[in-house]
Every structure is written in structure tokens, then in C-alpha cells.
Amino acid sequence: MLGFVTGVLAISAHVIVSQPNEHSPVVVARETYGLRDVIFRRLRSYETDTASARAEEGTSDIEERSDHEIPPDFYKRLASTSTPYVANLSHKAQIAAQALRKDAERSKGALELLKKYAELEGKMDAPKEEKNHVDRLKAAAFKEWNEKGLNLDQVRVLFADNKRRTSKYENLIEKIVGEYEKS
């Protein structure tokens, strides 16, 4: 029975780790992977604690014991020590997902502004409506950044979608940051 429970826990821990989740940062994934290690460490420590009893019986593994030979409090102790750890991981994952959503919303305006600037940069005779649209986006973004009290370095970070894309628009980013500094 314990072999079955151990197998189920190992498989579920592997599934948790192997399933991609875009809202879960690497730190939470590492801690989730650590859950499997915690469970196996606790199983090994239980085996170590009862090593002398097994040596007398001639058994080497807890999996070799039948259900009635395993102390009834073993599952209870394992669950009581593992459940808070799992609950804590779930809470951390929720907090991390909320932070990622906030960051995505915050940088969304910056990336949209950069995209519109790039579109206007290529056009010599851009229609007045497009220029007005960019000005409205810029005013809204600058207002939001001023309310949050962002400094110039923090504004540059908002545009850091990925390295390749950022280096392509470096001049435009500096232009936007310069305009933000003047405002």
C-alpha cells in the first residue's frame, strides 16, 4: 500500500513540475519540485527511525511490509507534515501570479506606446489622427508613471519585453524616456 501511495505522490509531483504554467515563476516551480524531495526525505527518515526493527524482522524496505505492519500513525504524520508545505506553495503561486499579471498590465501600456512610436517613425507624412492617438497614449502613460512615481530607470525597465526587441527599438525607447523626463 505504501508503495502505491509513494508512487502516486511521485507521479503527481512529477506532473506538477512537468506541466508548464505561464503564471508560475521559476522559484515556485523549484519549490514544487522540492515537494517530491520533501516527501521522499520524510519516507527515508521514517525508514531510518525504524531500521533496527526491520533488521530484526529481516525486511529492508517499508514497501515490503503489509499494511497491518505499518504503524497507523505513519500516514497521519506524513500528511500533517506535507499538507502545510503544499498549502504554502499554493499561496506563493497565487501571489506570484498576481504580481506577474500586474507587471504585464503595467508594461502593456509601455509596449503599446513603443509600437505606435515605431509605426510613426517609419512614416514621414503620418495622418494627424495617428499623431493624436500617440499623443493620447503618451499622456496616459506619463500620467500613470508620474502617479506611481517611477524614475527613468524604472521606465526603461517597462520596455524590457525581451533583449532582442529592446535593442531594436533602443533609440525610440530613449526618445520616450527623454520626453518623460521633460514632462
Curated annotation (Swiss-Prot):
Keywords: Glycoprotein, Host cytoplasm, Host nucleus, Secreted, Signal, Virulence
UniProt signal peptide: 1-18
One cellular component term from this protein's GO annotations in UniProt: host cell nucleus
Domain of life of the organism encoding this protein: Eukaryota
Subcellular location(s) per record: Secreted; Host nucleus; Host cytoplasm
Glycosylation sites: N88
Predominant location: secreted
Motif (RxLR-dEER): 41-65
Entry domain remark: The RxLR-dEER motif acts to carry the protein into the host cell cytoplasm through binding to cell surface phosphatidylinositol-3-phosphate.
Similarity comment text for this entry: Belongs to the RxLR effector family.
Biological function: Secreted effector that dos not suppress the host cell death induced by cell death-inducing proteins.
Protein's recorded name: Secreted RxLR effector protein 41
Organism per entry: Plasmopara viticola
Gene that this polypeptide is encoded by: RXLR41
